[in-house]
Amino acid sequence: MYPAHLLVLLAVCVSLLGASDIPPQPLNLYQFGNMIQCANHGRRPTQHYTDYGCYCGKGGSGTPVDELDRCCKTHDDCYTEAGKKGCYPKLTLYSWKCGSDGPQCDDSETGCQRFVCDCDATAAKCFAKAPYNKENYNIKTPCQ
């Protein structure tokens, strides 16, 4: 092997080692957002749920502030259960369809895909039923 080839091979290996430290990005959040739109028939933008109450959005703590926030806590708890089963819910892709009564998971899905799909479909339907209180969006009070 020529020295130039060895240098290229070394550079590729170093690049791959560096990339292994980059945390994976949530892949199924796009699917979950589409499920939310399916369930609420496009009446409320998905981003309205990203910083709502104590549990809608990144993280979560304290007591849910209302019914919608309880939907988010239940969804968080469902993802925790998925993790206990060895699933990676934020990285798990699945098949589903938008029916007249909201999102429906594909019957052919099994294991982690089915579990995570059920978490997301249940949450999306819960979001659609729960009242949206504008005063709970981007709340400033700490959740305890």
Swiss-Prot record:
Q: Which Pfam families match?
A: Phospholip_A2_1
The entry's Ca(2+)-binding residues are 55, 57, 59, 76
**Which molecular function GO terms apply here?**
calcium ion binding; calcium-dependent phospholipase A2 activity; phospholipid binding; toxin activity
Q: Which residues form the propeptide?
A: 20-27
Entry's cofactor comment: Binds 1 Ca(2+) ion.
Kindly state a single biological-process term from the GO annotations of this entry. Answer: phospholipid metabolic process
Query: What disulfide bonds does the UniProt entry report for this chain?
Result: 38-98, 54-143, 56-72, 71-126, 78-119, 87-112, 105-117
Tell me which tissues or organs this protein is expressed in. Expressed by the venom gland.
Query: Which UniProt keywords are given for this protein, alphabetically ordered?
Result: Calcium, Disulfide bond, Hemostasis impairing toxin, Hydrolase, Lipid degradation, Lipid metabolism, Metal-binding, Platelet aggregation inhibiting toxin, Secreted, Signal, Toxin
What cofactor is needed? Ca(2+)
Top-rank taxon of the source lineage equals Eukaryota
Compartments, as annotated in UniProt: Secreted
Q: Which residues form the signal peptide?
A: 1-19
Which InterPro entries does this entry report, sorted A to Z?
PLipase_A2, PLipase_A2_Asp_AS, PLipase_A2_dom, PLipase_A2_dom_sf, PLipase_A2_His_AS
Q: Where would you say this protein principally sits, based on its record?
A: secreted
Q: Which Gene3D superfamilies match?
A: Phospholipase A2 domain (1.20.90.10)
EC numbers? 3.1.1.4
Can you supply one Gene Ontology CC term for this chain's record?
Answer: extracellular region
Q: Where, by residue number, is the active site?
A: 75, 120
Reactions catalysed, as given in the entry: a 1,2-diacyl-sn-glycero-3-phosphocholine + H2O = a 1-acyl-sn-glycero-3-phosphocholine + a fatty acid + H(+)
Physiological role: Snake venom phospholipase A2 (PLA2) that inhibits collagen-induced platelet aggregation. PLA2 catalyzes the calcium-dependent hydrolysis of the 2-acyl groups in 3-sn-phosphoglycerides.
Belongs to which family?
Belongs to the phospholipase A2 family. Group I subfamily. D49 sub-subfamily.
From the Swiss-Prot or TrEMBL record, give the protein name. Answer: Acidic phospholipase A2 S15-109
Can you name the source organism?
Answer: Austrelaps superbus
High-level lineage: Eukaryota, Metazoa, Chordata, Craniata, Vertebrata
